[in-house]
Amino acid sequence: MNTRMILSLLMMIGGLALLLLITTSWAPARGVNNSTVGTVDWGRYTGSWYEIARKPHSFEKGMSHVKATYTARPDGTIEVRNEGIKNGKHKVARGKARTTNTPGQLKVTFFIFPGEYNIMELGPDYSYSVVGGSNGSYLWILARTPELNPATLNGIYSRLEERGYDLSDLLLVEQ
């Protein structure tokens, strides 16, 4: 085999591996119901939310005291400010969200990376929110206060398990 054939073969294998990685990480998780709530009053939803628990992922690894603040903008979008403490330093990420045709769903963009923000459960008084991504690997439990009533939190856990979520790796966030 000559060098050109070997390089072509390596590029083809690399391309197939990349395609496999993309399709498996972005595909909906089997058996997970991430359907959204029927309606959201976005005026009530804006404001500050404390992160109570989350599935682990790279962009929040090692973060504590995490809080998200949503602010309505005149153009109809929502400004997103996520902040927390990592290695003793205050970190802030800013993004923009817009509603979609699906009730209870936002498309949130940080830098150039868009993602689905599916509000799967919302407290009747907007005191807590359960948010998932496009697959079962993203999950957040948010509350208006740094702590959530244990009975409420246990009820959320039960309903998430009924939706097919594996909570064995769920992280409680230090506030």
Q: Which role fits each region the language model picked out?
A:
Residues 2-175:
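A beta-rich soluble binding module of mature secreted/lumenal proteins
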